[in-house]
């Protein structure tokens, strides 16, 4: 019996929304998306479908109401052809993506945005649960490890994990047949280009 192995090679350091870094990611085999930035999440989402580089996006949130924790949630979602993307699941905030892609000068000049991004706190136990689920999903997709779910929701208050189906919207600009799907370099990625000062 042959055994399939998983090997990790290389290191890319930088902001994934920078054009040069994003270009390097198009040649990878797989991406784990662990970010608090909407812009980087939007970039990885589109890159996964446009360049056919599967990815797993994961996120956590703690909602506080009246000074008390109302919910503790996590989400793990595979981004690959025939699976709905973050746009299909309304998982991206277009205004936040726009704001994060602006330069500091553009943000100061924009009359529509007054507030900076509010990062979610990193909570190790919650991050650990979501990361473990992401690794299990990866193993089930690429090895003989059992598991069929390609989207999971974690409820930290109830201590439960439930699978969810995320169908691809036929008219989706990212994963739909008339969108970025398999377009490779013939479509632009939502990247930040280096600004040259004159």
Model regions and ranges:
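Rossmann-fold cofactor-recognition segment
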Residues: 6-12
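Glycine-rich phosphate/adenylate-binding loop
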Residues: 20-198
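Glycine-rich phosphate-binding loop and adjoining beta1-alpha1-beta2 segment
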Residues: 1-5
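Conserved SAM/SAH-binding loop
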Residues: 12-20
């Amino acid at each position: 019996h042959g055994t399939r192995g998983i090997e990790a090679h290389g290191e890319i350091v930088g902001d994934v929304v920078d054009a040069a870094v994003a270009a390097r990611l198009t040649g990878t085999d797989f991406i784990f998306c662990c970010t608090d930035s909407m812009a980087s999440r939007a970039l990885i989402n589109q890159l996964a479908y446009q360049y056919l580089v599967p990815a797993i996006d994961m996120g956590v949130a703690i909602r506080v109401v009246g000074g008390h924790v109302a919910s503790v949630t996590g989400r793990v979602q595979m981004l690959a052809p025939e699976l709905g993307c973050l746009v299909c699941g309304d998982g991206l905030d277009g205004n936040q993506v726009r704001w994060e892609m602006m330069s500091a000068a553009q943000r100061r000049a924009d009359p529509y945005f007054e507030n900076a991004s509010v990062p979610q706190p990193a909570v190790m136990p919650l991050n650990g649960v979501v990361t473990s689920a992401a690794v299990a999903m990866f193993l089930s997709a690429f090895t003989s490890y059992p598991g069929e779910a390609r989207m999971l929701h974690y409820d930290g208050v109830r201590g439960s994990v439930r699978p969810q189906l995320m169908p691809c919207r036929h008219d989706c600009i990212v994963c739909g047949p008339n969108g970025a799907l398999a377009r490779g370099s013939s479509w632009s990625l939502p990247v930040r280009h280096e600004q040259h000062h004159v």
